[in-house]
Swiss-Prot record:
SUPFAM superfamilies reported in the protein's UniProt record: Cysteine proteinases
Family matches, as PANTHER family: CYSTEINE PROTEASE FAMILY C1-RELATED
Residue positions with a glycan: 206
Gene Ontology biological process terms from the UniProt entry: proteolysis
EC number(s) recorded for this UniProt protein: 3.4.22.-
InterPro entries linked to this entry: Papain-like_cys_pep_sf, Pept_asp_AS, Pept_cys_AS, Pept_his_AS, Peptidase_C1A, Peptidase_C1A_C, Peptidase_C1A_papain-like, Prot_inhib_I29
Propeptide: 61-229
Active-site residues annotated for this sequence: 253, 382, 404
Protein name (record): Cysteine proteinase
Amino acid sequence: MYSSSVVSNPNERLVNNRVENDLESSDDTLSTQAKPVSRLLTRKLLLGVVVLFFLAGVSVVSYFLFSKYKMLNKFKRELDDHLTKDFPNLERSKRDTCFDELTRLFGDGFLSDDPKLEYEVYREFEEFNSKYNRRHATQQERLNRLVTFRSNYLEVKEQKGDEPYVKGINRFSDLTEREFYKLFPVMKPPKATYSNGYYLLSHMANKTYLKNLKKALNTDEDVDLAKLTGENLDWRRSSSVTSVKDQSNCGGCWAFSTVGSVEGYYMSHFDKSYELSVQELLDCDSFSNGCQGGLLESAYEYVRKYGLVSAKDLPFVDKARRCSVPKAKKVSVPSYHVFKGKEVMTRSLTSSPCSVYLSVSPELAKYKSGVFTGECGKSLNHAVVLVGEGYDEVTKKRYWVVQNSWGTDWGENGYMRLERTNMGTDKCGVLDTSMSAFEL
């Protein structure tokens, strides 16, 4: 017996099946129609989001451009007022050039919104160009130099006095770090040469040397050469150091250091004052490369073998030329030695002003006065003359006295006091290698 809910009539079953099929077909149709609608809504939503982001971006850019426009106009107005009020006699052409260059750099984002400060930097830059005879090939090069100079000038201006040395503006102030190191390629120092203590003591035992040594040590007492260390010795006290020289744009520090040391040797040992020709070394030392760099060892060997004429007979011309030496009196050295480490102080410096290598850096190049404790270069790349050692009462630091060849407007009238660290080859590698002239 079947349930009453079961349809037994075939016709009725057929009708029911058709109804069910129609309902399923209707559902499929609705589903098919809903999909395009859903896609359309999704696309409209995405388009709306894109439009909103675009409008937001346009608004931000517009706001930025408008703000930049307002700031530029404000800078122009304040700069114009500053020039008109505080510099009424400024030539019109110079005023226009200054105004155009500063507003251009401000618009490019290189300057602050303080026109008084920026014009101060600008005036210092103009004085710098005049002092060091700078010429710029294009306006873009000039503006690039101004931006670099500005960075160095503000670093000097904003010193807080926390360091025991003072920075200053000098010939390197418009150079980038990369350009600076290009001027000072790595130098390879020679190996030490053997010399026993008795040999060194015997050559120093002459009256002229002992007289000058006592002056250099600032003492009237007799000096025990066997215990001589080099501390508190300054060859400038005995007038055993010749004048500061200027290598200008020539990378000939190796020649200047050699000549300065040889001149110091004759002053300290024989009271003979010479101004020898750096140019002869630049022109004629075939193992070096003139103003592109050279070797101290090669320079000393040239002086030993051939000697040097005076600077008056063959003056420095800021470039290397074909070797042509006039017939004139020559000064040579009988011998020379290379020292390393502590012997740079105890044997080389105690004998006379000596040539040493340094690892110089852009920070060191900014030095103006005080005891330099700043960052050195990573490799030996410069040669100078070591003339003494001392102690600074203010900073409570010991230091080395170095004569540079960057002119008297650099450092302390051409000299530098370099912190003595007593670590390794000491500050900036000053104790790495030295060379000194000696008697046979």
